[in-house]
């Protein structure tokens, strides 16, 4: 028998606002990514942003800090936004999944690509 793909549907609040979705994501166990992550990394900045940027997943530094795009990818993003004349606080930044997927590599946590099912669970 085939196992149903993971889903976060059971964790969706009845009222879909950024604050209620943030709270729901913080307690989501809809897929296994939450098990090894330090915390949920939800999207940030203005609710009515003119630009939305979606990354693959939080990285090691984002997992520790609890904020998206604060590590190396965030520095590249900040530089690109500055060159384009776009203020970071005008951009809503988030990731396709809200937990850092990794595998140990010595003392480091090495990024591991989330599966299509994990991404689908986080939609």
Where would I find each of the regions flagged by the language model?
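A polyanion-binding, active-site-adjacent surface
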Residues: 1-123
């Amino acid at each position: 028998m085939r196992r149903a793909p993971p889903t976060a549907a059971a964790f969706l609040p009845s009222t879909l606002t950024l604050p209620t979705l943030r709270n729901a994501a913080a307690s989501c166990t809809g897929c296994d990514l939450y098990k090894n992550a330090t915390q949920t990394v939800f999207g940030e900045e203005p609710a009515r942003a003119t630009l939305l940027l979606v990354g693959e997943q939080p990285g090691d530094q984002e997992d520790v800090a609890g904020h998206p795009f604060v590590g190396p990818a965030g520095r590249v993003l900040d530089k690109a936004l500055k060159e384009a004349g776009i203020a970071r606080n005008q951009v809503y930044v988030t990731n396709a999944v809200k937990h850092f997927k990794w595998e140990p590599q010595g003392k480091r946590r090495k990024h591991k690509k989330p599966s299509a099912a994990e991404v689908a669970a986080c939609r």
